[in-house]
UniProtKB/Swiss-Prot annotation:
Keyword Glycosyltransferase carried by entry: yes
Source species: Klebsiella pneumoniae (strain 342)
UniProt-recorded Gene Ontology molecular function terms: lipopolysaccharide N-acetylmannosaminouronosyltransferase activity
Protein name (Swiss-Prot/TrEMBL): UDP-N-acetyl-D-mannosaminuronic acid transferase
Domain of life: Bacteria
Known role: Catalyzes the synthesis of Und-PP-GlcNAc-ManNAcA (Lipid II), the second lipid-linked intermediate involved in enterobacterial common antigen (ECA) synthesis.
Taxonomic placement: Bacteria, Pseudomonadati, Pseudomonadota, Gammaproteobacteria, Enterobacterales
Length: 246
């Protein structure tokens, strides 16, 4: 049974988002009564909201995901503005993945890892086993051909994995999860972007101080000035926020 731990749902521009109070609430919801939920986890930030608005294929992919949660602080602020009584906090995708892996290790939940460079994936597997004794039942780096996809789906199914995390970037990872679930729906799928790189130290996140201030985007911009065009696109989201169009 997986119904006793609930979470409210909120609408932002037609997307139905889960409102988790904190990380513990998220874990308890996903592992309700010790039974892991099945479906697809997708992190929602301002950039993803814009992609949904501009690309019908992306909208269809995101709308089909069972569990959409507020990964970006701007989305959290929009939820609180639209729903003043909402008790919702940011649950960063990278942090949720680590917490989920720790819980999976404690519960003995079988995990399949997809995506990333070969050396990064190998390091990720090693650290997960050393740190939390995660039961990794299979893995595949991100360098596979379209012709190999069906065989990979079958490997995931045959492994009996109950958590499948996919680090391929959006929307490629959402397409992969949608297609794999058609063959093997009995798992929790999670799109994790560049999380393996962060976990293994190849990419550094903003210090917690910057994260707490909601300035992680600005920290990344300082390190990568080439991101400025992407940041300018987010002005449209700010307009939605301040004009009540969310």
């Amino acid at each position: 049974m997986t119904g006793t731990i609930s979470a409210p749902l909120y609408l932002l521009r037609g997307l139905q988002l889960i409102g988790w109070r904190d990380m513990q609430h998220a874990l308890d919801y996903l592992y309700a009564d010790g039974a892991l939920r099945e479906g697809t986890l997708v992190a929602i930030n301002a950039e993803k909201m814009l992609a949904v608005e501009d690309n019908p294929e992306v909208r269809a992919l995101i709308e089909a995901a069972e569990f959409k949660y507020a990964d970006g602080i701007s989305v959290v602020r929009s939820l609180r503005k639209k729903y003043p009584q909402a008790q919702v906090s940011r649950v960063a995708g990278a942090d949720l993945w680590e917490a989920l892996m720790q819980r999976a290790g404690a519960e003995g939940t079988p995990v399949f890892l997809v995506g990333g460079k070969p050396e990064v994936l190998t390091q990720t597997e090693s650290r997960l086993r050393q740190r939390w004794q995660v039961n990794i039942v299979g893995s595949q780096d991100g360098y596979f051909t379209p012709e190999q996809r069906q065989t990979l789906f079958e490997r995931i199914r045959d492994s009996g994995a109950k958590i499948v995390t996919v680090a391929m970037g959006s929307p490629r990872q959402e397409i992969f999860m949608r297609d794999c679930r058609r063959l093997y729906p009995h798992a929790l799928y999670m799109g994790v972007g560049g999380t393996y790189d962060v976990f293994t130290g190849h990419v550094h996140r903003a210090p917690k101080f910057w994260q707490d201030l909601g300035l992680e985007w600005f920290y990344r911009l300082l390190l990568q000035p080439s991101r400025i065009k992407r940041q300018f696109r987010l002005l449209r989201y700010l307009r939605w926020h301040y004009t009540g169009k969310l």
